[in-house]
Amino acid sequence: MGKIIGIDLGTTNSCVAVMQGTQPTVIENSEGNRTTPSMVAVTKTGDRLVGQAAKRQAITNPKNTVFSIKRFMGRKYDEVPNEKKLASYDVINEGGEARVKINDKIYSPQEVSAMILQKMKQTAEDFLGEKVTEAVITVPAYFNDAQRQATKDAGRIAGLDVKRIINEPTAAALAYGLDKKMSSEKVAVFDLGGGTFDISILELGDGVFEVKSTDGDTHLGGDDFDQKIIDYLADEFKKQEGIDLRNDAIALQRLKEAAEKAKVELSSRTDTEINLPFITATQEGPKHLVINLTRAKFEAMCADLFEKILEPCHRAVKNSKLDMKEIDEVVLVGGSTRIPKVQTLVKEFFGKEPNRSVNPDEVVAIGAAIQGGVLKGDVTDVLLLDVSPLSLGIETLGGVMTRLIEANTTIPTRKQEVFSTAADSQTSVEVHVLQGERPMASDNKTLGRFHLGDIPPAPRGVPQIEVTFDIDSNGILSVSAKDKATGKEQTIRIEASGKLNDAEIEKMKQDAKEHAAEDQKKKEEIDIRNSADSLIFSTEKQLTELGDKIPADKKPRLEGSLEKLKEAYKNGTAESIKSAMDDLNKEWSDIASSLYQTPDAGAPGASGPSAGGEPETGKKGGDGEVQNAEYEVIDGNDK
């Protein structure tokens, strides 16, 4: 059995880690970075780019570059009006579900997330040198059932068996507390990422990680701070030039990148200059954007966002039934916690300096890897007790939501309650499953509906319908309804209407595999072309250096093979390039044999110039190693 990797599938960046013995290791991607931008793009030629490659071309290809897809996971189209405004790409309504359009093809958010997960999977496989099929994936603690299901589906499409969905603050607490098993402390994990905000209160001790309460806002994160800067820059430029840059997709993408950079700079400086030359043009000529932004101004225009951060904190502390002074540490997680004002708010609210001992960008992936180690049996003496973030219940008479499972109930859990009919001779009931904290059913999130029929006719209130709610370790819900008189039972695993069915997932998995094969083929072609380029360079260098030492009868054939390789490199396929390389190496091998028979000739290596770099020179010794000797030419007259 292979390793279970831990993946932090973030709004802005993603990260992958794995247990190496007893220690978690964050894995660098192919670009040498420990985090990967959560971005996907399709170029005009149809090439699919993920991560840094997608980010690099975002300015010139904004309509076909998708970012912050996590904010659309498991959501209806009418639930994401604000997120839609932040997107440079097209977000469309398909049967009430939010979908994205890339290069005229429609993708579900799960498919796009699967592309990012595939990149993380490949990163882990390259590092481990083996296939990876199992993963623990993190989600915001305040993700609802539909969003958790969507994340699990994305994992399946990417070819991963998702062993556990784990809440991000809980994962961070695991990473923070792994080496503190013997101590007992109460910890608040404050997680402000690119698209979501979570606050969880946990009790750590003797290897037990118990979540006391959790709260948050899945519409609040770094993207929203960026948007405040974007709007400010666009408004200022409109005042100066009379042009709204938000109507120009390329200019808007430049504003987005500049806003993100300015936000980062304001974490270490009190002001920054945003300078975007040639941002647009009119008949009068090119226009440039040069605006100075101070930290004070940034904090003032984001005041409403800072206020929103405090509300979930109040609720989380209240629901934990702990006094503020009982909380020992406040651990900061997520890139947006680097904003000085956020750190000040945390300090003022909790009355203590926040703990900055963990890397906010990597700690969640590390925690996921630890959970993978727990499931695998590599990490022992660790027990994780998480909670359901939102209340769960059904709609009852009068459109009221009757709760069966309260928010912050430890999971896994199972609750039963008996209900009855609302009318005489009623022979069927509809079970309307809800998630949320509002008293009226219509104000909460519908998770699903199902019917229980063939109830024997009886006066109102007589039939006994037993409803059971069952939440598994992933926080995913199953519901059953049973007529106690007949024993007839109806059970469903809650699937939001937007959830992908098995056939759709299998099709998407196949598409993902095909793209993975295409990506591998493309990489192999690039490797061949790089080798050919190196061989051409080495051959030309040796031709110059060896000159007349190359036998006259062999030189034309060598030069002919070189020209053939150049032509194949310029216009040919990978197969034709490889064939031309083989021919050229064969010619070099033949020439090398001749040169070795000439004592004073510096021959190329027996198989020709190295395709990976400089040609080898020198004489081979008896042990097969190249021997380089220093020698001196002595004139006979000096003897």
Swiss-Prot record:
The UniProt annotation puts the region (Disordered) at: 592-639
A Pfam family of the record is: HSP70
Q: Which CDD domains match?
A: ASKHA_NBD_HSP70_DnaK-like (cd10234)
Q: Which SUPFAM superfamilies match?
A: Actin-like ATPase domain (SSF53067), Heat shock protein 70kD (HSP70), C-terminal subdomain (SSF100934), Heat shock protein 70kD (HSP70), peptide-binding domain (SSF100920)
| Alphabetized UniProt keyword annotations | ATP-binding, Chaperone, Nucleotide-binding, Phosphoprotein, Stress response
Composition bias type Low complexity, residue spans: 601-613
Listed PROSITE patterns: HSP70_1, HSP70_2, HSP70_3
Where is the PTM Phosphothreonine found along the chain? Answer: 196
Q: Molecular function terms in GO for this entry?
A: ATP binding; ATP-dependent protein folding chaperone; unfolded protein binding
Q: Which HAMAP family match?
A: DnaK
Against PANTHER family, the record matches this protein to: HEAT SHOCK PROTEIN 70KDA
Similarity comment: family membership: Belongs to the heat shock protein 70 family.
Biological role? Acts as a chaperone.
Protein name in UniProt:
Chaperone protein DnaK
Q: What is the lineage of its organism?
A: Bacteria, Pseudomonadati, Chlorobiota, Chlorobiia, Chlorobiales
